[in-house]
Curated annotation (Swiss-Prot):
Outcome when changing residue 81 to A: Slightly reduced interaction with SH3KBP1
Effect noted on mutating residue 993 to K: No effect on regulation of circular dorsal ruffle size
Region of interest: Disordered: 89-144, 173-302
Region annotation (Required for interaction with SH3KBP1) ranges: 81-90
Organism: Homo sapiens (Human)
Modified residues (Phosphotyrosine): 231, 431, 504
Biased composition (Acidic residues): 225-236, 269-286
Post-translational changes noted in the entry: Phosphorylated by PTK6 following EGF stimulation which enhances EGFR signaling by delaying EGFR down-regulation; the interaction is mediated by the SH2 domain of PTK6. Phosphorylation promotes association with the Golgi apparatus and endosomes.
Tissues of expression: Detected in heart, skeletal muscle, spleen, kidney, liver, placenta, lung, peripheral blood leukocytes, adrenal gland, bone marrow, brain, lymph node, mammary gland, prostate, spinal cord, stomach, thyroid and trachea.
Residue ranges annotated for the Rho-GAP domain, each copy included: 954-1139
Domain Arf-GAP stretches: 535-660
Protein name: Arf-GAP with Rho-GAP domain, ANK repeat and PH domain-containing protein 1
Membrane topology label: Peripheral membrane protein
Domain SAM: 6-70
Length: 1450
């Protein structure tokens, strides 16, 4: 049977079921392709194949053993005659099949072996076997559990058994039949067969006559008392407790002994526990000895329903649901013996299905008292008259039937269910894992359930939530009840609690943390989705490889889709898609919206799907904006808005912008099979209802129908109401005052505030304005109480006005406002709702106070207009008064010596600074040709001008043209970075290919974007790699790109021209088309890269390497092809021709960069340039004032060189067995780290805090570690150590200090931590522990310090601290403790061996001369560093003397 089962099982599927898929390639290399070929494997053979982990080898061998071993058949007892009841339906007798005996007597060896049990399909009778002489068709088994990570294995044929099966169901008594009409739930239509309670499954092939229906439940109370003795109920109060109602006790069947029934009532807890509750309290005592008795009470686990409504069993599922229902084999009343073996039997409604044996207090209960997994039942035995036992691994359940016949029926049903379960288990991947009949849970763990003092063990398995008393019972397969999630719903209650709501009860759970609660919610929501869904459509759509991952964030197995965008998305992205609206994205579920998924729509997704969708919608997504599966909802929302509503990342069609041509192209495309073209045309604005020119087929949809293109028709129908993506254009606000009126007289109502003596920093509310009648005439602006008033409330003379400012709309309570500044340091604010009226007032006031000399300033829009004292040119002796107008980033000025206005481009200033003290400030504006000094004669209006000019001179946006620019239209950001790298990084190895620190790069780029002009890059403050990374990120993040979106594809197409002359000519044409700023930036950047590649012998960055780096950056592509890189490579190679560089300019450029490099090299060689040197304090042997040494540390100094220099200064000789080393000592952590002899010291000094210092002393344990490394084999180590996380608070107050045993494996690439699960009595059927590590760290990113700080209370004194630095330069640390000193040395030696590729100590230590400091590292200023003044503690961690006293005397 095993061979047949493995016939079609590949090694890859088998290893995946064992969670060892990483060895698939190893097996295939050794010619093992099918699972049957692995039968001869042994432990030695697996080791020879390269499988080094013993646990993995054992798992594979155990899986082989289980896969090819059939369990021994159950003992077959001798039969005895039993009278048959007439009301039991039985199949016709078959001579070849002897009757099934009761297992009460000894086995008769003369009888033939028990025949095999045929497989069962749903609730139908077992399938008949063919005779041995005929070919058996493929057997049909129940569907495998809905578990995505288990492989589906082929089913082997089962030996035949002739004759139809027997159905073991008792019919109701006469009294019970009278209750059927009122107990049927839900009521069935008249057309259905009576008593038809079987689930509606998929169509079945012809089969024997259907089974008689299941007996309707007895009308007893709805909810059971859980059969438990460990949990006492806490009375519930408040709104969270389920309501209790009084219900009538139902009469028991007349043929049975009357039983007392407890009902949910409003009685006190003591009343509920009295009387008849005693029996139930003793139910499980013998299975859990020593546990105090307590009752599971009805009120805590039930929510009563009206007595007129019968509760359907949870396994029945919702009507019409798609969840497969577990077929019921047998159900009826049985007497159950309490665990103590009492003679008082208790009546239970028992229900047996293919997976579980459950018993209830009544046949109306929704949830069982207890359930037993059929897979965990070892055998069933008869014990005396009418009694039988269900025996599991460590517990026996005793039942008593009404008669011997009924007992036999129950035993036969149980044996049949056990046999079927074992047959399925042998064929499932769970059996290969050693867990027969079990399903791996999606999530399992302990949760608090409201009303119980102890936690329950909860497991989410498939579409059910199972409740157990504890983990032990979970392993034994004996639980309390399970909840069918097809009728469940979960919702968050508070930070740690959530409710699972069903029609019968609300289960209120509490987790240990908010994160754990979120994980439980996700698992239960997944169970609900699985219960209500079918994966048929999803599996068909996932057949296309791109559809297996979310189109937006890349999450695996997405089960939602946008049917108009034709993309498959995950659940988290689907929620944000809904927020876009149906006009952008129509979201449907692959598993639940079954009616939507027609064959045509499925085929459309297979043709388009995520592959074509992302080639259009995500063609230009920069990596910095790409979504990840872990992205936050706000990030997803912004990304999806940009992607689908705005079309920010779409691939523009060549006809984009030409509506007529787009419509024509759409009409042509819909008649073909090119769906991607249709998608691109619609996404770029083609009209879906445009006129095609054919009256018979006027629309694209009609054309597609005429051409018989069903997929095109489906796509067009789904996009009938889809909006065309449109980018939100941020257009400058339109100004309403550009023409000067010939009159300066004006009147009307204005709203004004009281005059102020300082700038208006806060918004003035509408209530602060007063309505005044204002009159402008004769050079005076007067304002009155109303239009009839004669005396003005106040007036402003035009001659006293020094400045007129127009704030942006909606700055204050009124939509449009303007400010008037006077010589008396007063500010008047006026407002109006009408833009036209405000426009008129501004024009009139401006003409009233601007002299004719500066009338030209009024011909243009302005934001601020006025007069200021200034100094400029040759007249710096005295200040003059000039008129200035600010508009955007342009400051226009009219000076007395020249009547013509002169513009100043504020974003092109070389310098903008403020000089002088607070009383006499001067604004300095430096242009290439001149310097302008604007004085602050009046503080109020000068501060207004200062803020406005600074704002206008800063970057206005993210595009190139909005940046601060230089004289040649090159952005200052680009100029600063290129100039710095030219000065300091031309010879830096890997320049532009190496990345700087993320945090430093981000800070630098933010400061450059805010005000690049004020940022001066200095060699002692910024590293060249940080600057180069900032430049690359700036260019990549440009919204329109350096080559602009409109021309980007044209540039890429030009790179494919084969003729070099034609290609160069094409590049020159495209260069002219670029905007001026883009064109100047491209030339400056390519010129710089041309200089960089001239020193490729030193920096290793030739033209090809630079093209690889800058191609995707400049064209904002994903780098999948080399088109972008080819453009950059061509521009560098043809730099002289493309940019028309003459020979003289090229010669000067080469001479400049050569001189720069020579000067730096000469300065370094002569010792005149030591910008990279640090002066720091190093101690000899211990930290004392008399042992400190101040030493200059260049960038290239290693730890060995530092150690030798310190010893030279103190005249300390080095003996043969002396291992002098430089240690990094951290006083706060009470730990130290010996530096590797080749480790550079300068980077370490950068990271030292005030509580750290360097000490040169002997490494007492080095000799012992070298001896260990010389005698060991391999470069790995594994074993148990005590482990504690840095932020762990679990151990506070415990003797062990929060340290826990963990298993570690250290290899050449990483350090792995495994959680050790110990069990003195391992259960063979327990789920196998995952071999995935709990934590894993790259070995190169770890720093190991000897010692653990005392306040953590380490369990031993042999500990060390491990520090891990992430890619974002965030530090995390953990603490490890060994049991012995030698174990600590071995681990530490292995760390050093692996981290430094086997070179732990130099073979011949000598006094090496220090090399010349590297220029690329000499980028830090000369700063003296000293350690903390606090004295170091005498011990590290638990050491009582020297920090490495544990390593001495070796």
């Amino acid at each position: 049977m095993a061979e047949a089962g493995d016939a079609a099982l590949s090694v890859a599927e088998w290893l995946r079921a064992l969670h060892l898929e990483q060895y698939t390639g190893l097996f295939e290399q050794h010619g093992l392709v099918w699972a049957t070929e692995c039968q001869g494997l042994s432990d030695t053979r697996l080791m020879d194949m390269g499988m080094l982990l013993p646990g993995h080898r054992r798992r594979i061998l155990a899986g082989l053993l289980r896969a090819h071993t059939s369990p021994a058949p159950a003992p077959r007892p001798t039969p005895r005659p039993v009278p048959m009841k007439r009301h039991i339906f039985r199949s016709p007798p078959v001579p070849a099949t002897p009757p099934e005996p009761l297992p009460t007597t000894t086995e008769d060896e003369g009888l033939p072996a028990a025949p095999p049990i045929p497989p069962r399909r749903s609730c139908l009778p077992p399938t008949c076997f063919t005779t041995p002489s005929t070919a058996a068709p493929d057997p049909v088994l129940p569907p495998l559990p809905a578990k995505r990570h288990l492989a589906e294995l082929s089913v082997p044929p089962v030996p035949p058994r002739t004759g139809p099966p027997r159905l073991l169901v008792s019919l109701p008594t006469k009294e019970e039949e009278s209750l059927l009409p009122s107990l049927s739930s839900p009521p069935q239509p008249q057309s259905e067969e009576p008593l038809s309670t079987l689930p509606q499954g998929p169509p079945q092939p012809p089969s024997p006559p259907p089974c008689p229906p299941e007996i309707p439940p007895k009308p007893v109370r709805l909810f059971p008392e859980f059969d438990d003795s460990d949990y006492d109920e806490v009375p519930e109060e408040g709104p969270g407790a389920p309501a209790r109602v009084m219900t009538k006790k139902e009469e028991p069947p007349p043929s049975r002994v009357p039983r007392a029934v407890r009902v949910a009532s409003l009685l006190s807890e003591g009343e509920e526990l009295s009387g008849d509750d005693q029996g139930d309290e003793e139910e499980d005592d013998h299975a859990y000895e020593g546990v105090p008795n307590g009752g599971w009470h009805t009120s805590s686990l039930s929510l009563s329903l009206p007595s007129t409504i019968a509760a359907p069993h949870p396994m029945d599922g919702p009507p019409g649901g798609s969840t497969p229902v577990t077929p019921v084999i047998k159900a009826g009343w049985l007497d159950k013996n309490p665990p103590q073996g009492s003679y008082i039997y208790q009546k239970r409604w028992v229900r047996l299905d293919t997976d579980h044996l459950r018993y209830f207090d009544s046949n109306k209960d929704a949830y069982s008292k207890r359930f037993i997994s059929v897979a965990c039942i070892s055998h069933v035995a008869a014990i005396g008259d009418q009694k039988f036992e269900v025996i599991t691994n460590n517990r026996t359940f005793a039942f008593r039937a009404e008669s011997d016949v009924e007992r036999k029926e129950w035993m036969q049903a149980l044996q049949q269910a056990m046999a079927e379960q074992r047959a399925r288990a042998r064929l499932s991947s769970a059996y290969l894992l050693g867990v027969p009949g079990s399903e791996q849970p999606d999530r399992a763990g302990s949760l608090e359930l409201r009303g119980f003092k102890n936690k329950l063990y909860v497991a989410v398995v498939g579409d059910k939530v199972q409740l157990y008393k504890n983990l032990e019972e979970y392993h034994l397969g004996i639980g309390i009840t399970f909840i069918d999630m097809s009728v469940g719903n979960v919702k968050e209650v508070d930070r740690r609690s959530f409710d699972l709501t069903t029609p019968y009860r609300i289960f209120s759970f509490s987790a240990d943390s908010e994160l754990e609660k979120e994980q439980w919610l996700e698992a239960m929501q997944g169970a609900i989705a699985e219960a209500l869904s079918t994966s048929e459509v999803a599996e068909r759509i996932w057949a296309a490889a791109p559809n297996r991952f979310c189109a937006d964030c890349g999450a695996p197995q997405p089960d939602w889709a946008s049917i108009n965008l034709c993309v498959v998305i995950c659940k988290r992205c689907a929620g944000e898609h809904r927020g876009l609206g149906a006009g952008v994205s129509k979201v449907r579920s692959l598993k639940m919206d079954r009616k939507v998924w027609t064959e045509t729509l499925i085929e459309l997704f297979l043709q388009l799907g995520n592959g074509a969708g992302n080639r259009f919608w995500a063609a230009n997504v920069p990596p910095s904006e790409a979504l990840q599966p872990s992205s936050s909802p706000s990030t997803r929302r912004c990304h999806l808005e940009a992607k689908y509503r705005e079309g920010k990342y779409r691939r523009y069609h060549p006809l984009f912008g030409n509506q007529e041509e787009l419509d024509k192209a759409l009409c042509a495309a819909v008649t073909t099979t090119d769906l991607a073209e249709t998608q691109a045309l619609l996404g770029c604005g083609a009209g879906i209802n445009c006129f095609s020119g054919d009256p018979e087929a006027p629309t694209p949809l009609a054309l597609a129908e005429q051409a018989g293109q069903t997929l095109q028709m489906e796509f067009l129908r789904n996009n009938r109401t889809t909006e065309v993506p449109r980018l939100d254009s941020m257009k400058p606000l339109e100004k309403h005052y550009s023409v000067v009126l010939p009159t300066v007289s004006h009147s009307g109502f204005l709203y004004k505030t009281a005059s102020a003596g300082k700038l208006l920093q806060d918004r003035r509310a509408r209530e602060e304005f007063s309505r005044r009648w204002c009159v402008l005439g004769d050079g005076v602006l007067s304002y009155f109480e109303n239009e009839r008033a004669v005396t003005p409330n106040g007036e402003i003379r035009a001659s006293e006005i020094v400045c007129l400012a127009v704030p942006p709309p909606d700055t204050h309570g009124f939509e449009h406002t303007f400010e008037v500044y006077t010589e008396g340091e007063r500010l008047y604010l006026f407002g109006l709702e009408s833009a036209e009226q405000a426009h008129e007032w501004v024009k009139c006031i401006a003409k009233a106070f601007v002299p004719p000399l500066a009338e030209d300033l009024l011909a243009r829009d302005f934001e601020r207009l006025g007069r200021l004292p200034y100094k400029a040119g040759l007249s710096l002796q005295r200040a003059q008064e000039g008129w200035f107008s600010l508009s955007g980033s342009e400051l226009r000025a009219v000076f007395p010596e020249g009547p013509c206005e002169e513009p100043l481009q504020l974003r092109k200033l070389q310098e903008l600074s403020i000089q002088g003290d607070s009383e006499n400030q001067v604004l300095v504006l430096v242009e290439r040709r001149r310097t302008l000094y604007i004085q602050g004669e009046r503080r109020l209006d000068f501060m207004g001008w200062l803020g406005a000019i600074q704002k206008a001179a800063a970057s206005m946006g993210d595009t190139l043209s909005e940046q601060q620019l230089g004289d040649s239209d090159i952005p200052v950001i680009v100029y600063r970075c290129v100039d710095y790298i030219t000065q300091c990084g031309l010879t830096s190895e890997g320049i532009y290919r190496k990345c700087g620190q993320t945090s430093k790069t981000q800070r630098l780029l933010e400061s450059l974007r805010q005000d690049a002009r004020s940022v001066h890059l200095k060699e002692g403050e910024q590293h060249v790699d940080d600057v180069s990374s900032a430049l690359k990120r700036f260019l990549r993040d440009l919204p329109d790109g350096l080559f602009t979106r409109a021309q980007r594809l044209t540039w890429l197409e030009a790179s494919e021209i084969e003729d070099e002359e034609e290609k160069v000519s094409r590049y020159r044409e495209l260069l002219v088309r670029l905007p001026p700023v883009n064109r100047a930036t491209v030339k400056a950047l390519i010129s710089h890269l041309y200089c960089v590649q001239c020193f490729s012998d030193t920096n290793q960055m030739n033209v090809h390497n630079l093209a690889i780096v800058f191609g995707p950056t400049l064209f904002q592509t994903d780098g999948q092809d080399y088109k972008a890189g080819r453009v950059v490579e061509d521009l560098i190679n043809h730099y002289v021709v493309v940019f028309s560089v003459d020979e003289e300019e090229l010669r000067k450029q080469r001479e400049e960069i050569t001189a720069i490099v020579k000067m730096r090299v000469a300065g370094t060689a002569s010792g005149t340039q030591h910008a990279g040197d640090f002066i720091c304090t190093v101690y000899l042997e211990e930290k004392k004032a008399e042992t400190e040494q101040h030493i200059k540390v260049p960038a290239s100094m290693t730890a060995e060189e530092l150690t030798l220099e310190i010893l030279d200064r103190r005249n300390v000789g080095i003996r043969e067995k002396d291992y002098w080393t430089c240690f990094e000592v951290n006083e706060r952590e009470e730990a130290e780290r010996p530096l590797h002899f080749a480790e550079k010291v300068l980077p370490i000094l950068h990271g030292l805090g005030t509580d750290s210092h360097l000490v040169v002393k002997k490494h007492q344990a080095m000799e012992a570690m070298l001896l260990y490394l010389a005698s060991r084999v391999g470069d790995t180590k594994h074993g148990m150590m005590k482990f504690r996380e840095d932020r762990s608070l679990l151990g506070l107050g415990l003797p062990s200090g929060g340290f826990h045993d963990r298993y570690f494996i250290l290899n050449s690439s990483c350090l792995r931590l495994y959680k050790e699960v110990r069990s003195q009595r391992p259960w063979s059927g327990a789920p196998e522990t995952s071999h995935r590590p709990e934590k894993e760290w790259p070995i190169k990113s770890l720093k190991v310090y000897l010692g653990v700080k005392k306040k953590l209370r380490p369990p031993t004194c042999w500990g060390f601290t491990v520090v891990h630095e992430t890619e974002k330069h965030e530090k995390q640390q953990w603490y490890l403790c060994c049991d012995t000193q030698m174990e600590l040395r071995e681990w530490f030696a292995t760390f050093l061996f692996v981290q430094h590729d086997g070179l732990v100590w130099p073979s011949e230590p000598s006094r090496v001369s220090r090399a010349v400091p590297e220029v690329r590292l000499g980028s830090v200023s000369l700063i003296p560093l000293r350690g903390s003044e606090n004295e170091m503690r005498r011990s590290v961690a638990a050491f009582t003397a020297d920090p490495l006293s544990l390593l001495r005397n070796v």
